[in-house]
Amino acid sequence: MSIGLVGRKVGMTRIFTENGASVPVTVLEMSNNRVTQVRTPENDGYSAVQVAYGSRRNSRVNKSEAGHYAKAGVDAGELLREFRVAADVAAQYQPGAAVSVEVFQAGQKVDVTGVTQGKGFAGTIKRHNFKSQRASHGNSRSHNVPGSIGMAQDPGRVFPGKRMSGHMGAVSCTKQNLEVVRVDAERGLVLLKGAVPGSKGGHVVVRPAVKGGA
């Protein structure tokens, strides 16, 4: 399995296949990925490649981070991510090396992780797809309430994990087995079939699919 890349969601559009079918795609900008560290079983107990994305002013980087980037010989990034790989794959990379979007190929399946769009405080119907209660026939002012949230004196508490009203969205989410439709190495763009989590401009992490094959 190859390493993944970090990028930014540009937005959605569509492209047309040779037979005229319309395919909705999400455009990801994934240029300027560079290796900051290579983990080895001898030094770290596992094999991995650490990648930085984007740029950050030196005044916004603390001393430990600045030293980490300086050791790798790369500019400070806005995001660091680590990808577990086999030892022979990790040996192919050196700190400071650039990583191109060509690690992905058209037709490949990938997993995409991002932070979902925040929806603010939401009730149980919108947040958990609860059903509304009766509109009339004995129901008064209890149309959209969740109903009972527990039992009586025993156990005398609400169980953890009970689905209730609360903040909706703004959580990490992974969509699996999205197809790579096109790779534009010149502009550092990757086009994926369908939607990915997050708002326009949000960070995303793209890895080879762990379940869906090549």
Curated annotation (Swiss-Prot):
Keywords from the UniProt entry: Methylation, Ribonucleoprotein, Ribosomal protein, RNA-binding, rRNA-binding
Post-translational modification: Methylated by PrmB.
InterPro entries, per the entry: Ribosomal_uL3, Ribosomal_uL3_bac/org-type, Ribosomal_uL3_CS, Transl_B-barrel_sf
Region (Disordered): 131-153
One cellular component term from this protein's GO annotations in UniProt: cytosolic large ribosomal subunit
KW Electron transport (keyword) present: no
Composition bias, Polar residues: 132-145
Gene3D superfamilies reported for this sequence: 3.30.160.810, Translation factors
Record-listed N5-methylglutamine modification sites: 153
GO function terms (MF aspect): rRNA binding; structural constituent of ribosome
SUPFAM superfamilies attached to this UniProt entry: Translation proteins
Swiss-Prot/TrEMBL GO biological process terms: translation
Pfam families: Ribosomal_L3
Protein family according to the UniProt entry: Belongs to the universal ribosomal protein uL3 family.
Entry function: One of the primary rRNA binding proteins, it binds directly near the 3'-end of the 23S rRNA, where it nucleates assembly of the 50S subunit.
Quaternary context: Part of the 50S ribosomal subunit. Forms a cluster with proteins L14 and L19.
Protein name stated in the entry: Large ribosomal subunit protein uL3
Organism per entry: Thiobacillus denitrificans (strain ATCC 25259 / T1)
Lineage, opening ranks: Bacteria, Pseudomonadati, Pseudomonadota, Betaproteobacteria, Nitrosomonadales
